[in-house]
UniProtKB/Swiss-Prot annotation:
<keyword id="KW-0449">Lipoprotein</keyword>
<dbReference type="InterPro" id="IPR001760">
    <property type="entry name" value="Opsin"/>
</dbReference>
<dbReference type="GO" id="GO:0007602">
    <property type="term" value="P:phototransduction"/>
</dbReference>
<keyword id="KW-0807">Transducer</keyword>
<feature type="topological domain" description="Extracellular">
    <location>
        <begin position="1"/>
        <end position="30"/>
    </location>
</feature>
<dbReference type="InterPro" id="IPR017452">
    <property type="entry name" value="GPCR_Rhodpsn_7TM"/>
</dbReference>
<feature type="glycosylation site" description="N-linked (GlcNAc...) asparagine">
    <location>
        <position position="4"/>
    </location>
</feature>
<dbReference type="Pfam" id="PF00001">
    <property type="entry name" value="7tm_1"/>
</dbReference>
<feature type="glycosylation site" description="N-linked (GlcNAc...) asparagine">
    <location>
        <position position="192"/>
    </location>
</feature>
<keyword id="KW-0600">Photoreceptor protein</keyword>
<feature type="transmembrane region" description="Helical; Name=1">
    <location>
        <begin position="31"/>
        <end position="55"/>
    </location>
</feature>
<feature type="transmembrane region" description="Helical; Name=4">
    <location>
        <begin position="147"/>
        <end position="170"/>
    </location>
</feature>
<keyword id="KW-0472">Membrane</keyword>
<feature type="transmembrane region" description="Helical; Name=6">
    <location>
        <begin position="245"/>
        <end position="268"/>
    </location>
</feature>
<dbReference type="GO" id="GO:0007601">
    <property type="term" value="P:visual perception"/>
</dbReference>
<feature type="topological domain" description="Cytoplasmic">
    <location>
        <begin position="128"/>
        <end position="146"/>
    </location>
</feature>
<keyword id="KW-0325">Glycoprotein</keyword>
């Protein structure tokens, strides 16, 4: 089936808003499988992102400026879950987009808006760590107003690039299995292709470049600190931990957004390309699963957040800690520079 089938259903095939798309697009079992996946994503993402927001509200010590962008990411991911994954769940149960064309446009807009906020939050997070750790601005003090500005930028930038399809520059249409909506990669033409190419550059290439630049310089800074203290085990351990953490962060970003961006670019620039509906749906579902692993990678690995979460879940009781220092909680004689750099990469303390 051609990639533009969402726009022109074959004779005898119900429209995406008219009735079940099985067996025309895929077997009914495929829709059931996707519904199970989306149900799992909705349940898990709602819990983990909700916990991030609630714990951050309840514990003042978590509300340091460097943590604002993490809460911003959790809010964006929760909205993606509510506006995108939950709608997709209902539609896949029914086999078509049951809410109609207007809701399709609204869902496409909201998922694009909050998705762009999420991916740019990861880029701003990397930039903030670079500024704090590498000090390119000298004795710069990262404060609340800087954190708020970073969060505001993600929403303003996302609105700038998610609103045009509502105003005539491209459009939001059913995609893949026709149970979710997104930008019109399929139809072609200068109107759609110019938007897709602009979106690819501004909402994938730019944030990815910023992430790679920031984390590369951060690792070089930490490596230089480790080289000056070759005998300090804590320094060497911090370098290894941060290196692993950065690799996980970058790979998670690519896993989430590379399939979606590549698919959009290929379809937009190759007219008449043949892509099966199931394959066309995969990139969208990859991006939605990020709402589960983003908070796990960026927040739940935070030692101080773990402590506050356990305290909240245990109704104020703090589990006994062993005397052995964990990787995230260096002992009293640990190297201050290494621990400081590590904590600022995955912040646990106010700066």
């Amino acid at each position: 089936m051609s990639s533009n089938s969402s726009q022109a259903p074959p004779n005898g095939t119900p429209g995406p808003f008219d009735g079940p798309q099985w067996p025309y697009q895929a077997p009914q079992s495929t829709y059931v499988g996707v519904a199970v996946l989306m149900g799992t994503v909705v349940a898990c993402a709602s819990v983990v992102n909700g916990l991030v927001i609630v714990v951050s509200i309840c514990y003042k010590k978590l509300r340091s400026p460097l943590n604002y962008i993490l809460v911003n990411l959790a809010v964006a991911d929760l909205l993606v879950t509510l506006c995108g994954s939950s709608v997709s769940l209902s539609n896949n149960i029914n086999g078509f987009f049951v809410f109609g064309r207007r809701m399709c446009e609204l869902e496409g807009f909201m998922v694009s808006l909050t998705g762009i906020v999420g991916l740019w939050s990861l880029a701003i997070l990397a930039l903030e760590r670079y500024v704090v750790v590498c000090k390119p601005l000298g004795d710069f003090q990262f404060q609340r107003r800087h954190a708020v500005s970073g969060c505001a930028f993600t929403w303003g930038w996302a609105l700038l690039w998610s609103a045009p399809p509502l105003l005539g520059w491209s459009s939001y249409v059913p995609e893949g299995l026709r149970t979710s909506c997104g930008p019109n990669w399929y139809t072609g033409g200068s109107n759609n292709n110019s938007y897709i190419l602009s979106l690819f550059v501004t909402c994938f290439v730019l944030p990815l470049s910023l992430i790679l630049f920031s984390y590369t310089n951060l690792l070089l800074t930490l490596r230089a600190a480790a080289a000056q203290q070759k005998e300090a085990d804590t320094t060497q351990r911090a370098e290894r931990e941060v290196t692993r953490m950065v690799i996980v962060m970058v790979m998670a970003f690519l896993l989430c957004w590379l399939p979606y961006s590549t698919f959009a670019l290929v379809v937009a620039t190759h007219k008449g390309i043949i892509i099966q509906p199931v394959l066309a749906s995969l990139p969208s579902y990859f991006s939605k699963t990020a709402t589960v692993y983003n908070p796990i990678i960026y927040v739940f690995m935070n030692k101080q957040f773990q402590s506050c979460l356990l305290e909240m879940l245990c109704c104020g009781y703090q589990p006994q800690r062993t005397g052995k220092a964990s990787p995230g909680t260096p002992g009293p004689h640990a190297d201050v520079t290494a621990a400081g750099l590590r904590n600022k990469v995955m912040p646990a303390h106010p700066v």
